UniProtKB/Swiss-Prot annotation:
MF (Gene Ontology): crossover junction DNA endonuclease activity; DNA binding; magnesium ion binding
Species whose genome carries this gene: Allorhizobium ampelinum (strain ATCC BAA-846 / DSM 112012 / S4)
List of catalytic residues: D11, E71, D143
Gene: ruvC
Lineage of source species: Bacteria, Pseudomonadati, Pseudomonadota, Alphaproteobacteria, Hyphomicrobiales
Protein name: Crossover junction endodeoxyribonuclease RuvC
SUPFAM superfamilies, sorted: Ribonuclease H-like
Keyword Transport listed: no
Length: 169
C-alpha cells in the first residue's frame, strides 16, 4: 500500500514568502497547513534573506514534507526588483534542498492551469478552486493561497519526466 506524499508549495517573495503544505494520495488532496514568512523591510537585504531562510526552515522542520515545489519567477521591467525576487527564490529552493527534499519548479501559468483549468486566471478563481479541492483549506492572503496552488500543481504533475529525474537524484 502506498502512503500519502506530503508536499510543500512555496511562493517566493522578499517581503512575503507564502507556503502551503498538503498531502496527496492517489487523486485525493488533504490540506495540512499554510502561512506566510515575512521579512522586515527596514532591514538590509542579507538580514531579510536570513529571516526568510530561518522562517522556511522552521516550517519544513515542523511539517516534514517529502517533496517541495517552488514557483518560477518572471522578469519585470524593474531589474532591481527582479534580482531581489530571484534571491528570495534562491532561499525558497535552498531550504527544502538542504533538508534533502526534491524540489520541482513550475511557471505561474502552469500552476493556474493545473488548479483552475486555464493559464490566465485571477486570484479569486484560485481561492474558489482551493476551497473546492480542499474544503478544509485555510489561507490568509494571496501568498499562502498561491503556495497551496503550487503544491496542488506539483501533486498533479509529480509523475512527470522532470520530477522523476529529480527524485532519482
Amino acid at each position: 500500500m502506498t502512503s500519502a506524499i506530503r508536499i510543500i508549495g512555496i511562493d517566493p517573495g522578499l517581503r512575503r514568502t507564502g507556503w502551503g503544505v498538503i498531502e496527496t494520495l492517489g487523486n485525493s488532496l488533504r490540506f495540512i497547513a499554510s502561512g506566510t514568512v515575512m521579512s522586515d523591510g527596514d532591514m538590509d537585504l542579507a538580514s531579510r534573506l536570513c529571516q526568510l531562510h530561518d522562517g522556511l526552515a522552521d516550517v519544513v522542520h515542523l511539517h516534514q514534507p517529502d517533496e517541495a515545489a517552488v514557483e518560477q519567477t518572471f522578469v519585470n521591467k524593474d531589474a532591481v526588483a527582479t534580482l531581489k525576487l530571484g534571491q528570495a527564490r534562491g532561499i525558497a529552493m535552498l531550504v527544502p534542498a538542504r533538508a534533502g527534499l526534491p524540489v520541482a519548479e513550475y511557471a505561474p501559468n502552469a500552476v493556474k492551469k493545473s488548479v483552475i483549468g486555464v493559464g490566465h486566471g485571477d486570484k479569486q478563481q484560485i481561492h474558489m478552486m482551493l476551497k473546492i479541492l480542499m474544503p478544509k483549506a485555510e489561507f490568509k492572503g494571496n501568498d499562502a493561497a498561491d503556495a497551496l496552488a503550487i503544491a496542488i500543481c506539483h501533486a498533479h504533475n509529480r509523475g512527470g519526466e522532470r520530477m522523476r529525474r529529480a527524485l532519482a537524484g
